[in-house]
Amino acid sequence: LWERLGQDLTLQDLMQQCRFEVLATTKLPMAIDFLNSELKHTGVLAPGMRRLSHYFTAYQAFLVEQAEEDRGRFDFRTALLVLQSEANYKASSAFDRQGLFFFQFEALCRHRLKYDAGLKSMSQDPAYDVAWQEWLLIVQKQLGLVDLADLIYGRSEEFVTYRKRHLGPDARPEYPILFGEREGKIAFANRRKEPLYLFAAMQRHLGYPPVPKREIVDQTLELIPQMQRRLERLEARMKFMEEEQRQGIDITKFFGRGGPPMVDLGENT
């Protein structure tokens, strides 16, 4: 769908084409028909995706909903790229919950989406277990009051080692541990810093796919043809002005090959 957005076709027509190209042995064509009907009646896809919860997660529906907002800067093409990268990562052998969390949360940060609704939709993703879902709701409430790196460090093996070193070997974590020792060290090193540095370090360490960014169209290649057309119009206007100052404008050259049109003045009887 993303590859065909630039073919000057409506989204309804593209959905109809995709419906005939998927495997007929599955029920996916029925889901595409349902989304196409929702698109024709309401003009948006997100409500239909929420109703098809067995095909789309709440986070995926949230991304499409943000892309369909009129005042948002998150365009639909970028949303499809994010959905594609997330689906490929979930299907790969390198998938883990830590990488999925950083990928989804980095998408919220880079595209300036709503953190509250975004984290809530992340907590409803079936890829996370109960411990992850509870922690995501905690992050939703504490984000902005507590640094993200501190929230990650508090659920890491590095923090458990720190507690045992200062409180004794019998010190046990009070909450489920979600991150390893290396992730805790990276989070501790990036405290009070720009979150993008934390994401870059985690992306290199965990190997999750980079978050697609908004494509910036280079308009410099279109400037020269535009300037050329403007110069041609200015040149034509200058010629008209010169002819008018000399002897008037000769309008006969604008006539067709048949000569000037004949005007029937009629006769008074």
Question: Which residues does each PLM region occupy?
Answer:
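Catalytic metal-binding core of the metallo-beta-lactamase
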Residues: 1-269
